[in-house]
Amino acid sequence: MEIRIMLFILMMMVMPVSYAACYSELSVQHNLVVQGDFALTQTQMATYEHNFNDSSCVSTNTITPMSPSDIIVGLYNDTIKLNLHFEWTNKNNITLSNNQTSFTSGYSVTVTPAASNAKVNVSAGGGGSVMINGVATLSSASSSTRGSAAVQFLLCLLGGKSWDACVNSYRNALAQNAGVYSFNLTLSYNPITTTCKPDDLLITLDSIPVSQLPATGNKATINSKQGDIILRCKNLLGQQNQTSRKMQVYLSSSDLLTNSNTILKGAEDNGVGFILESNGSPVTLLNITNSSKGYTNLKEVAAKSKLTDTTVSIPITASYYVYDTNKVKSGALEATALINVKYD
């Protein structure tokens, strides 16, 4: 009886030496630069592969690609959100036999825009570059260990923990008596951003005799003059000069008549001011000191719009306007409005 016990102990000591296993934790990092005109193309794909060499592997082992998860990446304070979809180039298990220690695996990533309300998994903060750990992982762990680790990873994310924390926990769960092989990805995006800068515009009206001014509340029908607001656009996309984002053009001023968002008055209260018109309708200017009444959208350019030229022209007409005949007197008139371009 005593001999059998000793033999059993001896067998337990010897058997693990020949047990097939890999124990290393290896990782590789790749870099993905999202194209500057991504706002136009809306999709980008890249493929990566790597040859892992795990010298700890003995006998025969099976390396299993784990199912990858889509990742939402936030850039520039999460104002840009990208969806990263990962797929293995070969989903089949990899068999290492006869003490083989190296194998090659790869994956593809497809980048598309994410919804504005999508929950961000990995954020670059205020920047445009971020390193994402564990975008794709392989392991020699048993099926039960892999299943348990996958559930643990999902619960970790649902519990609100960070991507890195969940990936580290996931790797640790897989690494129990098994090899773990991970792909990390650094993503960078410096988007081409269309800007349209307005030229200064001076509209000078010809003098008008006081006798030809209309009654209070009317614009003069003579000596009106048209000018063109010119926007000079840069960073257009592709050969068709497409815009990367939506733009709106409007006017604002601090020289508005009290209780009016359409009448510009000079420094002196002499009963006469100016009214601006676009396509035959009065232009509502944003009151710099009181923005509650809104403004007229002089021009809207949608994202991906094709511009025939790098300039945008917006015609506008200026006319005299009498707001109080009792104050009318001769003299120079001058008022200023600002040309604003709003981007979305």
Swiss-Prot record:
N-terminal signal peptide: 1-20
Coiled-coil parts of chain: none
Keyword Transmembrane helix: no
Record-linked InterPro entries: Adhesion_dom_fimbrial, Adhesion_dom_fimbrial_sf, Adhesion_dom_sf, UCP030811
GO CC, alphabetical: pilus
Keyword field contains DNA damage: no
Biological process according to GO: cell adhesion involved in single-species biofilm formation
Induction: Expression is negatively regulated by H-NS and subjected to cAMP receptor protein (CRP)-mediated catabolite repression.
Protein keywords: Signal
Note: The operon is cryptic under classical laboratory conditions, but is functional when constitutively expressed.
Role noted for this protein: Part of the yehABCD fimbrial operon. Could contribute to adhesion to various surfaces in specific environmental niches.
Homology family: Belongs to the fimbrial protein family.
Protein name: Uncharacterized fimbrial-like protein YehA
Name of the coding gene: yehA
